[in-house]
UniProtKB/Swiss-Prot annotation:
GO biological process: actin filament depolymerization; barbed-end actin filament capping; positive regulation of neuron projection development; regulation of lamellipodium assembly
Sequence segments annotated as region (Disordered): 324-349
Protein name, entry field: Twinfilin-2
Gene: TWF2
Keywords attached to this entry: Actin-binding, Cytoplasm, Cytoskeleton, Repeat
Subcellular location per the Swiss-Prot or TrEMBL entry: Cytoplasm, Cytoskeleton; Cytoplasm, Perinuclear region
PROSITE patterns, alphabetized: ADF_H (PS51263)
Domain ADF-H: 4-139, 177-313
Quaternary structure (record): Interacts with G-actin; ADP-actin form and capping protein (CP).
Pfam assignment, any one: Cofilin_ADF
Family the entry assigns: Belongs to the actin-binding proteins ADF family. Twinfilin subfamily.
Major place of residence: cytoplasm
UniProt GO MF annotations: actin filament binding; actin monomer binding
């Protein structure tokens, strides 16, 4: 699993996540205790999601303690019910806790299952993450809008966390992160990968010059991937994953963000985390390179053929069908009924 801060979920929390994903739980509060992610509180289903939202969410938010809240919506996707992920980081909480919770956010989503999360919100005051705040958030996602107070606070937290000056000339900061410029050879490598003339790119941040540099583009098989992951520094990787799926031959670009946890400085961890989303935006929007899967790891040993396949083609949740009642002989079933009983023809009512 990916644990950029060395923090991971307890067995009890993982078990509760599994239970919650079946739809019986409305809310999960997660906190960090003794360097572990633990269950802080939970709420069972009661009424419609929007009716219970403020009554369930707001009382659980401490004015001095960050936390994560997962709130189950009533909509569903192929993997089951969709969830809202809330990162709560109040103004009065210590900077150290803000940094810790910010750096562990990706781990919580991965532990729960990112495919179940429909929306994310960040809040420093309760109004930001209230039902009204969420509705404004959904509206703002459909069109560009000025930064909210919470978004401005998130920017400032990131600036404080990395403890580095940000000049207008060197990079641009938005809610999505920092934008270090791609060096020319890195841009050329991305174009070459798009043309499928190479199958691997490794990039690194130059923390002094504030640029994204090309490390190498060595030909790489799946068996070589673990050796490409440095054990003492972070990297960005693009890999052209050639494989077969359901009888079709596919060539899928996979983005890998490797971060070996505490072996890197806080500044390095925060800068790599902040630059990642802007790099991906640039690659996908400006270079028009389609990325099939984005993966975060802390150890190259995770990159097996089976792991890559499961990440690119996640197994769908199987829904057990009701037992199909056998049909009687043709022509001897009596008069046709207007309303079918539950379970008939193998369908639930």
């Amino acid at each position: 699993m990916t644990h950029q801060t060395g923090i991971h979920a307890t067995t009890e929390l993982r078990d509760f996540f599994a239970k919650a994903r079946n739809g019986s739980v409305r809310l999960i509060k997660v906190i960090i205790e003794e360097e572990q992610l633990v269950l802080g509180a939970h709420k069972e289903l009661a009424r419609r999601w929007d009716v219970d939202y403020d009554a369930f969410v707001l009382p659980l938010l401490d004015e001095q303690q960050p936390c994560y809240v997962l709130y189950r919506l009533d909509s569903q996707n192929a993997q089951g019910y969709e969830w809202l992920f809330i990162s709560w980081s109040p103004d009065n909480s210590p900077v150290r806790l803000k940094m810790l919770y910010a750096a562990t956010r990706a781990t919580v989503k991965k532990e729960f299952g990112g495919g179940h999360i429909k929306d994310e919100m960040f809040g420093t005051v309760k109004e930001d993450v209230s039902l009204s705040g969420y509705q404004k958030h959904v509206s703002s996602c459909s069109a560009p809008a000025p930064l909210t107070a919470a978004e401005q606070e998130l920017q400032q937290i990131r600036i404080n966390e990395v403890k580095t000056e940000i000049s207008v000339e060197s990079k641009h900061q938005t809610l999505q992160g920092l934008a270090f410029p791609l060096q020319l050879d890195a841009q050329q490598a991305i174009q070459t990968l798009k043309q499928k003339k190479i199958n691997y790119i490794q990039l690194k941040l130059d923390l002094e010059r504030e640029t994204i540099d090309l490390v190498h583009t060595s030909p790489t098989d799946i068996s070589d991937l673990p050796k490409r992951i440095p054990q003492d520094s972070a990297r960005y990787h693009f890999f052209l994953y050639k494989h077969s799926h359901e009888g079709d031959y596919l060539e899928s670009v996979v983005f890998i963000y490797s971060m070996p946890g505490y072996k890197c400085s806080i500044k390095e961890r925060m800068l790599y985390s902040s630059c990642k989303s802007r790099l991906l935006d640039t690659v996908e929007q400006e270079f028009c390179l389609e990325i099939a899967k984005k993966i975060e790891i802390d150890d190259g040993a995770e990159l097996t053929a089976e792991f890559l396949y499961d990440e690119v083609h996640p197994k769908q949740h199987a829904f057990k069908q009701a037992f199909a009642k056998p049909k009687g002989p043709v022509g001897k079933r009596g008069q046709k009924r207007l309303i079918k009983g539950p379970g008939e023809n193998g369908e639930d009512s």
